[in-house]
Design a protein with these regions (language model features):
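NAD(P)+-binding Rossmann beta1-loop-alpha1 motif at the extreme N-terminus of oxidoreductases
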Residues: 1-30
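ATP-dependent carboxylate/acyl-activation modules
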Residues: 2-5, 259-277
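N-terminal glycine-rich dinucleotide-binding loop that anchors FAD/FMN and/or NAD(P) in oxidoreductases
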Residues: 30-51
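Rossmann-like NAD(P)(H) cofactor-binding subdomain of soluble oxidoreductases
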Residues: 74-144
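Short acidic-hydrophobic, aromatic-tinged amphipathic segments that line or gate anion-handling sites
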Residues: 52-56
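Internal alpha-helical scaffold of NAD(P)-dependent oxidoreductase catalytic cores
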Residues: 121-239, 265-272
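Redox-cofactor binding/interface segments in oxidoreductases and associated redox assembly factors
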Residues: 67-69, 108
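An anion/phosphate-binding loop that grips the pyrophosphate of nucleotide cofactors and donors
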Residues: 63-64
Length: 278
């Protein structure tokens, strides 16, 4: 989907995928996923030639200046992150960079734990191509797209995060977002990786919080949706940057007491609140 959105914004894009069935669909101007507007968008950019697709990574690298790597990072049985696809693609792109004339920017977009780009991707590229710098650059640029609204999210993201090895690569990444109305935050590569996880974990926390409030309210006959509607109307404290500083103390005369009372109320009604109990 990102490939089509970048093509729509005037870039020449070469999409790479090992699945020939997906490639054939896209060559026919059809999306390999079901989502509003994507079929039409892919049909448009395939027809005008701004997007073409291939299964050959070397072909794509030779024809472009920047590689955006978006591959799966499945969970291992122990919960750790599987980076086998990242490693495989890095090997392919590294070989292509070594063989091409000119400099190339390798940008990882997959969600990976902090340290992965520098600890997994960088050593592979250095082994194949050489040191980061003259021949290629390295960056991390997470995407913030939700299923079902990905085109809208691409056009109006909350921000763009760019973690890069040097100024040239930061500018290269920023350049592909020209025209996207969103603030750009530059940082180091590992910080960029951590930001993506912090965002996802915050979303998970919000969902859990809302569900636990809902469960507790149900036990005492309170309309939890009304509660959350008014809670979210407070943008000074509740929906804001307040209390979001790492290391901020939890204590005082109210918060611990109120937490104990609310969790006890729910617990005795057979609705323990796991997040708050923790």
């Amino acid at each position: 989907m990102s490939a089509a959105c970048f093509a729509k914004r005037g870039h020449e894009v070469v999409g790479v995928d090992p699945d020939e069935r997906k490639l054939e669909l896209m060559r026919a101007g059809k999306a390999p996923v079901v989502e509003e507007g994507v079929d039409e968008l892919i049909g448009e950019v395939i027809a005008d030639g701004s997007l073409r697709v291939t299964s050959d990574a070397a072909e794509a690298v030779a024809a472009t200046d920047v590689s955006l790597v978006c591959v799966g990072t499945p969970s291992a049985p122990d919960g750790s992150l599987g980076v086998q696809y990242v490693e495989r693609v890095t090997e392919e792109i590294g070989a292509a960079i070594a063989a091409k004339d000119g400099r190339h920017t390798f940008v990882l977009r997959s969600t990976v734990v902090p340290g992965t780009t520098l600890g997994v991707v960088k050593p592979i590229l250095e082994r194949i191509v050489g040191p980061v710098g003259e021949k290629y650059g390295l960056a991390y640029n997470p995407e913030f797209l939700r299923e079902g609204t990905s085109i809208k999210d691409f056009d109006a993201p909350p921000f763009t995060i760019v973690g890069a090895s040097d100024e040239r690569d930061a500018q290269a990444v920023e350049g592909i977002y020209a025209g996207v109305e969103a603030p750009v935050h530059r940082c180091d590569i590992s910080t960029a990786e951590a930001i993506k996880y912090a965002c996802n974990l915050f979303h998970a926390t919000k969902i859990t919080f809302a569900n636990e409030i809902g469960m507790a309210c149900q036990t005492v006959g309170v309309d939890s949706r009304k509660v959350m509607e008014i809670v979210c109307a407070d943008t000074k404290l509740n929906v804001s940057a307040k209390y979001m500083r790492p290391g901020f103390a939890f204590g005082g005369s109210c918060l611990p007491k109120d937490l104990r009372a609310f969790t006890h109320m729910s617990r005795v009604r057979n609705a323990p609140l796991s997040m708050f109990e923790a």
